[in-house]
Structures are given as C-alpha cells and as structure tokens.
A protein has these predicted regions:
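Soluble non-transmembrane domains of integral membrane proteins
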Residues: 1-8
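Generic hydrophobic alpha-helical segments
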Residues: 149-152, 247-251
C-alpha cells in the first residue's frame, strides 16, 4: 500500500518539481537579462509565481505527506505557500497585459497582504488554525482570478487585442477550470488534487514563459538599437569624435544653473 501511494503520487510530484525548476530558471534568466538592459518585470513575477506554485504542488502530493518527518510543519508550509500565491499572480497579470488601472491591482494586493497578516495573527494567537482560515485564502485567490478576468475584458472592450491577450484568454479558461476542480475536490474531502489540472497549468506557464522571454528579447534588441542610434547621433562616423549634439544636455544644464546678479 505504501509503495502504491508513492507510485500514484509520482506524476504530480514530478510536475511540481518541474514547476519549481522552471520558476528558478525564469528568475535566473530575468536577473541575468536585467543587468544588460531594461526589461519588464513580468518574467520576474512569473518566476516567483511558478516557484511558489510548484513548491505547493510538491507539498500537496500524497508521497510528500507520507515521507514527511514533521507533518505539522509540512501542513503549515503548504498553507503559507498558498497564502502567497495571489500577489505575484496579480503583479504578473498587470505587467504582462500592461494593465492601465492605477488603483485596482494595488487595492487587491494590499487586501491580500492584510489577509496574510490576519491569518498569521490568528494562528500565532491560537485563535484560529491555518486550516480553519483557509476559506479566506480561497476568497483572495478568487479575487485574483476576477482581476485577471477584468483585465482581459477591459482589453477587449478598448480593442487593444494582442497575442498576449489571446494567450491569457485561453489560459483563463484552463485556470478557472483547474481552480474550480481543485476547490471542489478539497471541499469534498480529497487529500490530493488530480494531475490533469497540474498538467494544464504547467503547459500554460510554459507558454507564458516562452512568450515573456520572446518579449524580453525584443526589449533588449530595442534598447541596443536605441543606444546605437544615440551613439550615431552624438559621434562623427569618420573621426569618432563627439559632435555638438552630445553637448546639448550639458549646455541646458549650464544655462539652468546661471544666476543673474
């Protein structure tokens, strides 16, 4: 029976490990590229989200529960990882889809921060256990998904459709289906979530990662072109010396600092 449970949870555990590895790879890629040129933070937040999600997947498998030396710590770690999921998800949606809302994302993020503080306070004061306040985390995950859907609908309403929007539209169907399936299984008493939702989420994340990497490469190329054009505008091609265009910012600074007596 023990071996059967390990084999049964082998695929979900492998999918969780793949998510963690993919998230670490994305974080490493963003940190490396960020030193060379300005790129969007969408890859950063997607890497944090994928790593957190993969670690939660690993802890929610039956094999990790059976192999855990400290079940209490295992349960608390799983709940805390789930608490942290909505924030990087909403920040990724805002940067990836280039949402124009000024306050909605911030309000949801601060609501999630307040929810985390309340849940941890109740746990530390022995008023409510993390398992008893799990419904609050589910509410915040639902709000994050609603923000995702709102951003997509807002883009369609203003006719600003891009390939990123179509990817997120298809991904939202997968995300909502997997979310409702997992929550239904949880409230029905299931101890483990099925591999179908994990596979769908992994494919969605891989698609987002590839598209985000492609966009970052375009941003790097645009930055290099801008630097090259600026160098061509400020230097003479034959002599390599700076021309008068290079000294215009200096002249403006000098003129602004002149004081008449």
């Amino acid at each position: 029976m023990f071996r059967h449970e390990l084999l049964k949870a082998g695929i979900p555990l492998l999918l969780g490990i793949m998510n963690v590895a993919l998230g670490i790879l994305m974080l490493t890629y963003w940190l490396f590229v960020h030193h060379w040129a300005y790129v969007s933070k969408s890859m950063l937040y997607l890497g944090i989200l994928t790593t957190d999600l993969g670690a939660w997947f690993c802890l929610e498998t039956g094999s990790s529960i059976l192999l855990s030396q400290n079940p209490v710590f295992h349960s608390y770690a799983s709940r805390i990882l789930l608490l942290l999921l909505p924030i990087p998800f909403m920040m990724f949606v805002r940067h990836y889809l280039k949402a124009k809302d000024q306050y909605l994302c911030r309000i949801f993020v601060w609501l999630d921060v307040a929810e985390i503080a309340v849940v941890l306070f109740l746990q530390l004061m022995d008023i409510r256990d993390l398992t008893q306040t799990l419904w609050m985390t589910h509410v915040m995950i639902g709000l994050a998904v609603l923000y995702f859907i709102y951003t997509i609908c807002n883009k369609f309403y203003h006719h600003t459709t891009t390939h990123a929007l179509w990817i997120c539209t298809i991904g939202s169907i997968i995300l909502i289906g997997a979310l409702f399936s997992d929550m239904f299984n949880y409230y029905q008493g299931a101890q483990d979530i099925g591999p179908a939702g994990r596979i769908a989420m992994l494919l969605f994340i891989v698609t987002l990662a590839c598209d985000t990497a492609f966009v970052s490469l375009k941003e790097i190329d645009a930055g290099r072109r801008a630097a090259l054009y600026r160098e061509l505008a400020e230097k003479d091609l034959l002599t390599g010396c700076y021309n008068r265009n290079a000294y215009q910012p200096v002249q403006k600074t000098d003129k602004s600092s002149v004081v008449c007596i």
